[in-house]
Amino acid sequence: MVRTAVLILLLVRFSEPAEHCNAQMNSGPWRIKNLSIAPPKETLQKDVEIEIVETNMDENVIIGYKGYYQAYAYNGGSLDPNTRIEETMETLNVAKEDLLMWSIRRQCEVGEELIDQWGSDSDNCFRNKDGRGVWVFGKELVKRQNNNHFARHTCNRSWRCGVSTAKMYTRLECDNDNDECKVTILDINGASINVTENTVLHRDGVSMVLKQKSTFSRRPEKVACLLIKDDKSDPRSVTREHCLVDNDIFDLSKNTWLCKFNRCIKRKSENVVKQRPPTWRHDVSAKHDEGASATKGDLMHIQEELMYENDLLRMNLELMHAHINKLNNMLHNLIVSVAKVDERLIGNLMNNSVSSTFLSDDTFLLMPCTHPPPHTSNCYNNSIYKEGRWVANTDSSQCIDFNNYKELAIDDDIEFWIPTIGNTTYHENWKDASGWSFIAQQKSNLISTMENTKFGGHTTSLSDITDMAKGELNAKLWSFMLGHAFSFMLTVGVIIFLFCMVRNRSRAY
């Protein structure tokens, strides 16, 4: 009896499976904890309607200048208190009609040069001060001063002029209330100046007028905008709204005109824009001074920000790579688990017709299998595809033709907005405009010529070289010649007298 009981126990023991699960020691119930998925702060909106107003980056400006230097002198001798030289340096305003004519002829009009006009001719210093009658391609004055006519007045006058059609940068400005826009011209410091096609502006020693009226164009356009929300609790709160316009990035968060140089952009924002948080980096509006030159420190700061962004991106990529690998390992475990039920799963994933047979928990064999050619029915020869397997079939009424199948979408494809660096439009410094270079050059020419004074009148190159007035030079030359002539005559007379004395004495003996 005892032997029988032991035999039964042994049979039960060896008939049990290799793995045993005890149902009486269960725990739970359990539920798999899903990770929370936070919605992104960024939202991409397509077909956002905006209005773009645009004008030319620069405009043609006619720049002209005209002026004269005059020296009116009187020579009454060193004892006369009226002996003096009255200098006048005058810059004349050029009228619009003159500027237009100068631009057409590519010449400027001045008055006649007055050189060493003395006596009654010196009255010319009081005539034709408006500079008419002489056309030149450009002229710089000569500073002449001479006062060598005793008891006479002397007049010297020299003219200067120039004309150029040059470029000056523009700025487009639009009013937020009535949406009216205007184009202004910028000076060397980037400030607006009042120069139009109808009004001549006189400044910095020149006169300037627009060659033609500035125009601008309006056009609607649909663009893509990226909305960034820093406040997750308020879905309609938008901190920034970056829109891609002509391959350039603009922040159109506010319902106002955003003007950059020669372009203004505006859209009607449907969201409520909150005050930006007072933190550094992209959450703070950029501080910039248009037209100001960047320093080496500014560029190094930008480089530092780029390095930070690059390191941050690298860290996020490494974290994402590790997480993807973790998901892949979890997927491998899931495939192994399901493949123990579906022996064709591994082969289907490899796109190969094989069947798997597991030897242990993670070790298996692969066996080749036959696979029917492509078909449009669930029947093939004497087989039917049923519940994931090809089985024998004798009932042809179960065959279905699925050549005209329909696709059923169970999820939506995610469309990514690929990051790109904006094609930023860079602007040259305001003072680099050719118009201001022309003005600076004419000022430099005037300074150079005023440092060189001509003291003579007509044909007085020697007086210019010796830096003497014509009268002084003549006096010195005459005194030099007369003195040497007197010495020569005196010497010759003495020699003749001595010769005669010697000759008379020889006759007496």
Swiss-Prot record:
Lipid moiety-binding region (O-palmitoyl serine): S479
Biological role: Envelope phosphoglycoprotein which mediates the fusion of viral and host endosomal membranes leading to virus entry into the host cell.
Keyword tags: Fusion of virus membrane with host endosomal membrane, Fusion of virus membrane with host membrane, Glycoprotein, Host cell membrane, Host membrane, Lipoprotein, Membrane, Palmitate, Phosphoprotein, Signal, Transmembrane, Transmembrane helix, Viral envelope protein, Viral penetration into host cytoplasm, Virion, Virus entry into host cell
Glycosites: N34, N156, N194, N351, N381, N423, N504
Primary localization class, coarse: virion
Topology of this chain in the membrane: Single-pass membrane protein
Organism: Choristoneura fumiferana nuclear polyhedrosis virus (CfMNPV)
UniProt family annotation: Belongs to the baculoviridae gp64 family.
Signal peptide bounds: 1-17
Transmembrane regions listed in the UniProt entry: 480-502
GO cellular component, one term: viral envelope
GO biological process: fusion of virus membrane with host endosome membrane; symbiont entry into host cell; symbiont-mediated perturbation of host process
Protein name from the UniProt record: Major envelope glycoprotein
Gene behind this protein: GP67
Source superkingdom: Viruses
Posttranslational mods: Palmitoylated.
Annotated InterPro entries: Baculovirus_Gp64 (IPR004955)
